[in-house]
């Protein structure tokens, strides 16, 4: 399908929202659905050709699109707002660090090779590699983003790696948002148009999405 500018922006926000949703679930419960984070990892490892739908699949971003509508029309969750704002902040800082960007590009290429080898982008080894990449790059820029949740879940190595990987997925979404004309003022002045675009995308999906 051919997306409008607002639909592209809605999809990039859905990437961020879905990443945040998964992060919150892992931090609070120790688990999240693979079907929700797998497309985020696939999109992180994939090549962007100008279509967020082609990279992620709008149907697989349905949970994120629903969150876009909820947060833009009637924001209720302060934690979600905080995480999203922090992800945008990290992305802006990252864009000023060419050496870090290069290191991330190299790490993504290595993770892509792993995903191809295991034929599974959500394989534990891939998640661990992407999580380590976040630690070695974004975390080193400081200060670190504080994740709220149950300590027993946050201290679990698998959960910690997945949370870091999802943060990098969210930053990728923020980069795509910027590539599609999104900025600080866009959410202020175009929030209803973007929420409407997210609704249109959801209505166009199969009912089982």
UniProtKB/Swiss-Prot annotation:
HAMAP family: HflD_protein. It is a peripheral membrane protein. It is found in: Cytoplasm; Cell inner membrane. PANTHER family: HIGH FREQUENCY LYSOGENIZATION PROTEIN HFLD. One of its GO terms (cellular component) is cytoplasm. InterPro entries: HflD (IPR007451), HflD-like_sf (IPR035932). Keywords: Cell inner membrane, Cell membrane, Cytoplasm, Membrane. Its main location: cytoplasm. It comes from the Bacteria. This is High frequency lysogenization protein HflD homolog. Belongs to the HflD family. Gene3D superfamilies: HflD-like.
């Amino acid at each position: 399908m051919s997306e409008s500018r607002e639909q592209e922006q809605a999809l990039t926000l859905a990437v961020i929202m879905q990443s945040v949703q998964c992060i919150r679930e892992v931090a609070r419960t120790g688990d999240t659905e693979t079907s929700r984070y797998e497309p985020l990892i696939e999109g992180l490892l994939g090549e962007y050709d100008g279509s967020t739908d082609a990279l992620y699949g709008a149907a697989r971003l349905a949970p994120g699109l629903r969150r876009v509508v909820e947060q833009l029309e009637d924001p209720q969750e302060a934690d979600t707002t905080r995480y999203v704002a922090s992800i945008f902040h990290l992305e802006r800082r990252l864009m000023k660090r060419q050496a870090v960007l290069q290191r991330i590009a190299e790490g993504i290429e290595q993770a892509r090779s792993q995903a191809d080898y295991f034929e599974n982008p959500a394989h534990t080894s891939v998640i661990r590699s992407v999580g380590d990449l976040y630690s070695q790059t974004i975390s080193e820029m400081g200060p670190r983003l504080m994740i709220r949740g149950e300590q027993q879940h946050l201290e679990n190595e698998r959960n910690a790696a997945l949370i870091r990987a999802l943060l990098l997925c969210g930053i990728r979404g923020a980069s795509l948002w910027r590539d599609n004309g999104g900025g600080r003022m866009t959410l202020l002045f175009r929030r209803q148009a973007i929420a409407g675009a997210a609704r249109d995308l959801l209505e166009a999906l199969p009912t089982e999405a």
